[in-house]
Amino acid sequence: MSFRGGGRGGFNRGGGGGGFNRGGGSNNHFRGGGGGGGGGGNFRGGGRGGFGRGGGRGGFNKFQDQGPPERVVLLGEFMHPCEDDIVCKCTTEENKVPYFNAPVYLENKEQIGKVDEIFGQLRDFYFSVKLSENMKASSFKKLQKFYIDPYKLLPLQRFLPRPPGEKGPPRGGGGGGGGGRGGRGGGRGGGGRGGGRGGGFRGGRGGGGGFRGGRGGGGGFRGRGH
């Protein structure tokens, strides 16, 4: 589920079905580069309706800290640390997708950090959390639960292909704030370091395969070099 910035107007429609990035092949890694259509149901192929390169206006601006929300809902469970970040399995209702840079909380609404990367398969994905300065990755327990403001979630259908014959504005770009810069690429692994079907994440920092959203400004997944 490697989202690259660039372009206007939402999410790229390459060949293949249901992928989230540009790469080719049908194994379920998030890797940049490559040619051809991605395999169905992963977060990297240039699939129709995936989280491709398209950024676009009107969605995912950089969050500003505004204190805890009125209520929080379950976002995911702690899997393992990765450098100074943590990797979590997403367990949201109906597989909703968190905005990039959305604040992540404990059940008591204490903020621990922000969503940094999202990766894995379409209906079985993971996310990493960039921890706040006062938080340590080693302080969390396996399967510890984390929470999010329900208004910082998007329906998975936003990123799926539109049924044949359905009319309406293109899916993807959407309105509303949220998001911000994307992740960095670089070997997160879904539920375990490295590759594998659980959502391996390939590509160096900022390379082919990282969420490359722009830093603030203009909304959308911004292009390279921002």
From Swiss-Prot:
Pfam families: Gar1 (PF04410)
MF terms in GO: box H/ACA snoRNA binding; RNA binding; telomerase RNA binding
Keywords per UniProt: Isopeptide bond, Nucleus, Repeat, Ribonucleoprotein, Ribosome biogenesis, RNA-binding, rRNA processing, Ubl conjugation
Main location class: nucleus
Superkingdom assignment: Eukaryota
Gene Ontology CC terms, in alphabetical order: box H/ACA snoRNP complex; box H/ACA telomerase RNP complex; Cajal body; chromosome, telomeric region; telomerase holoenzyme complex
Domains (record comment): Interaction with SMN1 requires at least one of the RGG-box regions.
Family indicated by similarity: Belongs to the GAR1 family.
SUPFAM superfamilies named among the record's database cross-references: Translation proteins
Subcellular location: Nucleus, Nucleolus; Nucleus, Cajal body
InterPro entries the record matches: Gar1/Naf1_Cbf5-bd_sf, H/ACA_rnp_Gar1/Naf1, Transl_B-barrel_sf
Annotated segments matching region RGG-box 1: 4-59
Compositionally skewed regions (Gly residues) per UniProt: 1-59, 170-226
Cross-link (Glycyl lysine isopeptide (Lys-Gly) (interchain with G-Cter in SUMO2)): 136
Subunit structure, interactors included: Part of the H/ACA small nucleolar ribonucleoprotein (H/ACA snoRNP) complex, which contains NHP2/NOLA2, GAR1/NOLA1, NOP10/NOLA3, and DKC1/NOLA4, which is presumed to be the catalytic subunit. The complex contains a stable core formed by binding of one or two NOP10-DKC1 heterodimers to NHP2; GAR1 subsequently binds to this core via DKC1. The complex binds a box H/ACA small nucleolar RNA (snoRNA), which may target the specific site of modification within the RNA substrate. The complex also interacts with TERC, which contains a 3'-terminal domain related to the box H/ACA snoRNAs.
Positions of region (Disordered): 1-66, 158-226
The protein, known as: H/ACA ribonucleoprotein complex subunit 1
Function, in words: Required for ribosome biogenesis and telomere maintenance. Part of the H/ACA small nucleolar ribonucleoprotein (H/ACA snoRNP) complex, which catalyzes pseudouridylation of rRNA. This involves the isomerization of uridine such that the ribose is subsequently attached to C5, instead of the normal N1. Each rRNA can contain up to 100 pseudouridine ('psi') residues, which may serve to stabilize the conformation of rRNAs. May also be required for correct processing or intranuclear trafficking of TERC, the RNA component of the telomerase reverse transcriptase (TERT) holoenzyme.
Gene assigned in the entry: Gar1
Source organism phylogeny: Eukaryota, Metazoa, Chordata, Craniata, Vertebrata
Biological processes per GO annotation: snoRNA guided rRNA pseudouridine synthesis; telomere maintenance via telomerase
Natural source organism: Rattus norvegicus
Chain residue ranges for the region called RGG-box 2: 171-226
